[in-house]
């Protein structure tokens, strides 16, 4: 039996890539799409909804969310309330929101996934960086994205920093008497690590994790040149969440 899928934010670039992936997979069935600004009532013969409230009671298994940080939490909560296992690529969740959604998913006996990045290479980068941080506590992150991205730093950069912070010796980097001549020049501070965000047209999603030690350096980098790079992870997420009973944060928990 096919897994019935709803896609929220289907008009965006990630939403469109997800639609094409679902439509070409015989194990998946795209049963509805959601976008508050869509004027048509159908898209490729699939019903279009403008208000998520109209999807209450709809027969579906999985809710894919590529919307905006402003509505992602409400959408994920709505999905769980209505029996849809969420697969969420929208970023901007607080740690408190993620914890609350995990608890609620267990109460609903539903699987779910919030993933800062669906590219398998990016997930591996985070794992490699976590291993390196045990031995190289001096580290900075540079994340680069297209100029339409609404949040900074990226969810991937935050997740990477969180994972490294769990194993890294906590130190304050840079000179003790360091002075920023322009505010923000040293980037955002996360437990002594610095995160730098670049936003330029022509980019998709890229991240470097740069480690330094006496007389040596180590640089890890991942590049997504096309949004198709995320679809393997989205597909995996759809097929895994329907088997599970709680929401997880990070694609690595499903690998």
UniProtKB/Swiss-Prot annotation:
It is found in: Cytoplasm. NAD(+) binds at residues 9-14, 35, 89-91, 115-118. Pfam families: DapB_C (PF05173), DapB_N (PF01113). One of its GO terms (molecular function) is NAD binding. Keywords: Amino-acid biosynthesis, Cytoplasm, Diaminopimelate biosynthesis, Lysine biosynthesis, NAD, NADP, Oxidoreductase. InterPro entries: DapB_C, DapB_N, DapB_N_CS, DHDPR_bac, NAD(P)-bd_dom_sf. (S)-2,3,4,5-tetrahydrodipicolinate binds at residues 146, 155-156. It catalyses: (S)-2,3,4,5-tetrahydrodipicolinate + NAD(+) + H2O = (2S,4S)-4-hydroxy-2,3,4,5-tetrahydrodipicolinate + NADH + H(+); (S)-2,3,4,5-tetrahydrodipicolinate + NADP(+) + H2O = (2S,4S)-4-hydroxy-2,3,4,5-tetrahydrodipicolinate + NADPH + H(+). Pathway: Amino-acid biosynthesis; L-lysine biosynthesis via DAP pathway; (S)-tetrahydrodipicolinate from L-aspartate: step 4/4. It is an enzyme of class 1 (oxidoreductase). The active site is at 145 (proton donor/acceptor), 149 (proton donor). Its EC number is 1.17.1.8. GO terms for biological process: diaminopimelate biosynthetic process; lysine biosynthetic process via diaminopimelate. GO terms for cellular component: cytosol. Catalyzes the conversion of 4-hydroxy-tetrahydrodipicolinate (HTPA) to tetrahydrodipicolinate. Belongs to the DapB family. This is 4-hydroxy-tetrahydrodipicolinate reductase.
């Amino acid at each position: 039996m096919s897994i019935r899928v709803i896609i929220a934010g289907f008009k965006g670039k990630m939403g469109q890539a997800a639609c094409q992936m679902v439509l070409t997979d015989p194990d998946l069935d795209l049963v509805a799409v959601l976008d508050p600004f869509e004027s048509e009532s159908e898209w490729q013969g699939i019903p279009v909804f403008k208000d998520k409230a109209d999807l209450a009671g709809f027969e579906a298994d999985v809710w894919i969310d590529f919307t905006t940080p402003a509505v992602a939490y409400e959408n994920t909560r709505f999905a769980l309330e209505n029996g849809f296992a969420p697969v969420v690529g929208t970023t901007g969740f607080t740690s408190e929101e993620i914890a609350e959604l995990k608890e609620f998913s267990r109460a609903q006996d539903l699987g779910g996934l919030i993933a800062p990045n669906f590219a398998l290479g990016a997930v591996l980068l985070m794992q490699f960086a976590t291993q390196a941080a045990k031995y190289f506590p001096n580290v900075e992150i540079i994340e680069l994205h297209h100029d339409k991205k609404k949040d900074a730093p990226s969810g991937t950069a935050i997740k990477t920093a969180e994972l490294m912070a769990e194993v890294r010796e906590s130190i304050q980097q840079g000179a003790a008497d360091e002075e920023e001549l322009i505010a923000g020049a040293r980037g955002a501070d996360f437990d002594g690590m610095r995160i730098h965000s670049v936003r330029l047209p022509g980019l998709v999603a890229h991240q470097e994790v740069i480690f330094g030690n006496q007389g040596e350096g180590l640089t890890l980098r991942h590049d997504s040149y096309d949004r198709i790079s995320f679809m393997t992870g989205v597909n995996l997420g759809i097929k895994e969440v329907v088997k599970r009973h709680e929401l997880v944060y990070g694609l690595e928990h499903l690998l």
